UniProtKB/Swiss-Prot annotation:
Keywords: Cilium biogenesis/degradation. Component of IFT complex A (IFT-A) involved in retrograde ciliary transport along microtubules from the ciliary tip to the base. Residues 1-107 are annotated as: Disordered. InterPro entries: IFT43. Pfam families: IFT43 (PF15305). Belongs to the IFT43 family. It comes from Salmo salar. It comes from the Eukaryota. PANTHER family: INTRAFLAGELLAR TRANSPORT PROTEIN 43 HOMOLOG. One of its GO terms (cellular component) is intraciliary transport particle A. This is Intraflagellar transport protein 43 homolog B.
Length: 215
């Protein structure tokens, strides 16, 4: 047996020499695992016999997204003081003194605006064309000033007519208030004078016709 073990050891040594450092490390790791396995088996058997629970689970290593989620969870548990400070910073800041009553704009009512507009508006004067009638005076002035008016259409001469025209003072009659008694007497007197003249003319005619017969 000793020879066999020695031969085996010599063979192992040769193999180790052949394998190099990496081979030695692998061999040592294999021996350690082979030695630890019976120990674990013994411990598990003893723990089951004693009635103890299963061994504790090893702590899991977290990486990648897990770290970010954990960080966000921690940030969610920040104190309320920090959150209040951040909320105040994020709020829109209004200038001081803007809440005063003098800064509030006053919107006028619609009725007041309409009344002001009506007061400011000025009615335009009506544009009506009136045909102005010329008076006698205007006609006289035109007749005296413009000699071209004395000829109508350049052919008819109106000089004879202009010479005979009477002035305005002679043609215009004054406005006199009528009285019934005065008007009756004037009309009756004129009629009587006309009748008298008619009778006298008739008598003269009769006398003329009767004179030759008498001769």
């Amino acid at each position: 047996m000793d020879d066999h073990l020695k031969l085996g050891d010599s063979g192992v040594v040769k193999n180790v020499a052949r394998l190099g450092r990496r081979g030695q490390r692998a061999r040592q790791a294999a021996e350690q695992t082979s030695l630890e396995e019976p120990r674990h088996v013994r411990k598990s058997s003893s723990s089951t016999s004693m009635g103890e629970g299963p061994p504790p689970k090893p702590a899991r290593r977290q990486g990648g997204w897990a770290e970010e989620t954990s960080g966000s969870a921690k940030s969610g548990r920040r104190p309320a003081m920090v959150q209040d400070v951040e909320d105040r910073r994020l709020r829109p800041q209004t200038p001081q003194g803007s809440d005063g009553e003098g800064d509030i704009p006053v919107i006028p009512d619609l009725d007041e605006v309409q009344e002001e507009d009506l007061n400011m508006q000025v009615a335009a004067p009506p544009s009506i064309q009136v045909n102005r009638v010329m008076t006698y005076r205007d006609l006289d002035n035109d007749l005296m000033k413009y000699s071209a008016f004395r000829t109508l259409d350049g052919e008819i001469d109106l000089k004879l007519l202009t010479k005979v025209l009477a002035p305005e003072q002679e043609v215009r009659e004054e406005d006199v208030g009528w009285d019934w008694d005065h008007l009756f007497t004037e009309v009756s007197s004129e009629l009587l004078t006309e009748w008298d003249q008619g009778e006298k003319e008739e008598q003269v005619c009769v006398m003329r016709t009767s004179l030759p017969k008498m001769g």
